[in-house]
């Protein structure tokens, strides 16, 4: 496993595509305040980021991704695809609305248009990360941005956390954001 920490803003983790190595890296990054990106040998080589897929579930911490995704879209000119979980409650929609408001406010403040679209997923919040990985050819994105698990429950210990499963199956780099209110801010 290689961890590149020369960048103050983002931590890059290059590791083998096996569950032990990925889980070790996930455990090492549990307290990380900045986003971290996983790259494995089975992922496609990415030369430019044009589209970023951002799955949004019912969990409140999903909104923490807004700042980072907006920053990346603004700096790379990438198009954001917000994939909303197909839930019966209104929490996923509220999170989408918060992220949308943040994107539009940053765009208005900076004068830089940020392109985004909202797509409805077929799966609920609990299966959304799996669907995001399955839709890689459909969305043609070059980066997948996920929220890391806040706590590991029994199912995470038995089957692995959803972010580890997404990293193992993904064909593109996966950026993780820890669910913390005091996240490292990306500044210009």
For the regions a protein language model found, what residue spans apply to each?
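Intrinsically disordered or low-complexity boundary/linker segments at protein termini
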Residues: 2-67, 75, 83, 169-188
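Glycine- and other small-residue-rich loops at beta-strand/loop junctions that grip anionic moieties
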Residues: 58, 121, 155
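Small/aliphatic-rich secondary-structure junction motif
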Residues: 51-118, 137-142, 169-170, 174, ...
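Short acidic/polar alpha-helix capping motifs at helix-coil junctions
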Residues: 32-35, 94-99, 126-130
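Short, well-ordered secondary-structure micro-motifs
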Residues: 65, 92-95, 127, 156-157, ...
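Short beta-strand-loop elements within alpha/beta enzyme cores
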Residues: 2-30, 129-169
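Short beta->alpha junction loops
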Residues: 1, 116-125
